A protein has these predicted regions:
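Left-handed beta-helix
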Residues: 1-91, 96-115, 122-123, 127, ...
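Conserved double-stranded beta-helix
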Residues: 149, 154-158
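Residue-level signal for beta-strand positions within conserved beta-sheet cores that form or flank
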Residues: 130
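Anionic group-transfer/hydrolysis microenvironments
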Residues: 138
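Noncatalytic nucleic-acid binding interfaces
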Residues: 134
Length: 158
């Protein structure tokens, strides 16, 4: 509840809520810069990231683990890759996943899961006509988006 505020600016997005007086003296760019200096991760990273194969949403980030929701579009797949610093655990919550792990293929349906150890070559593919949803739990000392060594990529990324 707000009392005695005649004019407010209210901006609501999926990952943030801004409520401020409609005052010409307030500099939004400067406020965001100040949040960046304090290492506020909401300023640095948007929770939903789009990729050629679909998207992922960061649900939770802590020091040694991170939880993401992956959406793999129909007939798409991620690159064949491995990670130097993290392990992953995938849980299928919607659809069917075709997972490659160290040259072996696993077909997973809803409520099935698989562990991807650090250093294992892996890929997930959605061969279906509907989106595939996976919850990914990453664990490790370093959880970096650029911790990817690609071996094959249909989208020609390095």
């Amino acid at each position: 509840m707000v009392i005695n505020k005649k004019y407010l600016i209210i901006i609501s997005t999926k990952d943030a809520l801004l409520v401020m007086p409609n005052d010409k003296n307030i500099n939004i760019k400067e406020s965001i810069k100040n949040l960046s200096k304090k290492n506020n991760e909401k300023v640095q990273y948007h929770p939903t990231v789009y990729r050629p194969w679909g998207s992922f949403e960061i649900l939770l980030t802590k020091k040694n683990y991170q939880v993401k929701k992956l959406i793999i579009n129909p007939k798409q797949k991620i690159s064949l890759q491995k990670h130097k610093y993290r392990s992953e655990h995938w849980i299928v919550v919607k659809g069917r996943a075709c997972v490659t792990k160290n040259n072996k293929t696993y077909n997973l349906k809803k409520n099935h899961s698989i562990d991807i150890p650090k250093g294992a070559k892996h890929r997930v593919e959605n061969k279906e006509k509907t989106p595939l949803t996976i919850i990914e739990i990453q664990t490790g000392d370093k959880l970096l988006e650029n911790d990817i060594i690609r071996f094959e990529d249909v989208y020609n990324r390095n």
